[in-house]
Amino acid sequence: MVTIRLARGGAKKRPFYQVVVTDSRNARDGRFIERVGFFNPIASGQAEALRLDLDRIEHWIGLGATVSDRVSVLIKDAKKAA
């Protein structure tokens, strides 16, 4: 099953997340099909905290991809800000 979820990056105590489309059987930070955005929870000042390619996300959802709980909240926030 294809899912849209967060893959963690960054350093220890300084998380940075990629929003990726992946097979649900793959590891959290493992192989993915497509990168559709990022989320920086500790962004400060002028730094961009969230960027999502909503067109590609809607494309994958249309093909039957499931969305993780946290990513669904991020999508809702991105649509509200746009």
Curated annotation (Swiss-Prot):
It holds the Pfam family Ribosomal_S16. One of its GO terms (cellular component) is cytoplasm. It comes from the Bacteria. GO terms for molecular function: structural constituent of ribosome. The keyword S-adenosyl-L-methionine does not apply. GO terms for biological process: translation. Keywords: Ribonucleoprotein, Ribosomal protein. NCBIfam families: S16. PANTHER family: 30S RIBOSOMAL PROTEIN S16, SMALL RIBOSOMAL SUBUNIT PROTEIN BS16M. Belongs to the bacterial ribosomal protein bS16 family. HAMAP family: Ribosomal_bS16. This is Small ribosomal subunit protein bS16. It comes from Yersinia pestis.
